[in-house]
Amino acid sequence: MQNLSKLALVMALSSPLAAFAVDGTITVDGLVTAQSCTINGVAPSGANNVAVKLPAVSISALKTVGATAGLTPLRIKVGGAGETGCADGKVASIAFEHGPNVTADGYLANKAATSPATNVVVQLFNDDGTGIKIGEAGTNNTKATISGNTATLEHSVGYRATGTVTAGAVSTSVMYSLSYN
């Protein structure tokens, strides 16, 4: 009888383990590459900051939700003449990182410290004018093929209304990463 009780105990304790049986293996492979191209003429260092000054716009230019205004070019040049580490034929692309200034909708929140405008965010745009929503797959599609050891990633940045806009300052930032494939 004791053996039967022990067998029942072992079976009872081992049955939940069957629910956690291994069904397969996920293998992850990747590649970490050396940053081989300069960014706007400066060696990559994590501090390759780019400043974009948006023009002043009237609140009347942003009177409906979703209206955009003040589109301003954002150009990031990778490589340069004679930079053999920035290989011709590779494709440069940029990823805008989902950081503390990114709204749930994928725009850049206004973080102006003094007299901020309200109901306005900053939006990034691809070279074809389509809007980018940071963190949403398929919305950031600008790429540039390196030729002559250089390429330029062309984007634009502008204001976007999220409600009835009030006048004031606009300031924000976003982190970015470049890749070359």
Task: Report each predicted region and the residues it spans.
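Hydrophobic helical h-region of N-terminal Sec-dependent signal peptides
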Residues: L9-L13
